Amino acid sequence: MANEEVILLDFWPSMFGMRLRIALAEKEIKYEYKEEDLRNKSPLLLQMNPIHKKIPVLIHNGKPICESIIAVEYIEEVWKDKAPNLLPSDPYDRAQARFWADYIDKKLYDFGRKLWTTKGEEQEAAKKDFIECLKVLEGALGDKPYFGGESFGFVDIALIGYYSWFYAYETFGNFSTEAECPKFVAWAKRCMQRESVAKSLPDQPKVLEFVKVLRQKFGLE
């Protein structure tokens, strides 16, 4: 498509924004990245996402696509002729991919957040839930290199952004993902070898420092 305008409104530590960065990189779509200050949201963000007022927002030729998973599907549908395919071609496999992306959003984010926003028994419960969630995902991965099989795709894109937060999760939750879920870590390292992922995810220590600042603001330090 010629003369296209693609803009991404994002915030660097957002695992949801990372999904769009990866998907756009996989499809080799050129876009303008606009970093948002979430304490002082831009008029463009408020105009493009008036309902939730959240990032990320993909803007394609002036039209906004909100919610990261929906936007990844949009990228696949609009640029379906550009390799690679991010979603499976088989309807059942596509439904399964959407199921696991939904599971990730409904479970992993909240459990991960509680690891650094809570203490004591509540934090211990969150750690247990978080590790159990990873083990469920390990089961879905099985012995495949990626969740969709031999090819990096939709579920991998939905999940890998969380990996940039794992140093923070482990630091405040006091556990080792590699000890608990070695297959998950092996998958994450495999994904990190892809240029689209490596260039889209911030360094784990940088995210840890960001979380430390948030904890101070929340009065947890």
From Swiss-Prot:
Residues 90-214 form the GST C-terminal domain. Its EC number is 2.5.1.18. Root tip-specific expression. It catalyses: RX + glutathione = an S-substituted glutathione + a halide anion + H(+). One of its GO terms (biological process) is auxin-activated signaling pathway. Pfam families: GST_C, GST_N. One of its GO terms (molecular function) is glutathione transferase activity. SUPFAM superfamilies: GST C-terminal domain-like (SSF47616), Thioredoxin-like (SSF52833). Gene3D superfamilies: 1.20.1050.10, Glutaredoxin (3.40.30.10). InterPro entries: Glutathione-S-Trfase_C-like, Glutathione-S-Trfase_C_sf, Glutathione_S-Trfase_N, GST_C, GST_C_Tau, Omega/Tau-like, Thioredoxin-like_sf. Glutathione binds at residues 14, 41, 55, 67-68. Keywords: Auxin signaling pathway, Transferase. The keyword Transferase applies. Coiled coil: none annotated. One of its GO terms (cellular component) is cytoplasm. Belongs to the GST superfamily. HSP26 family. This is Probable glutathione S-transferase.
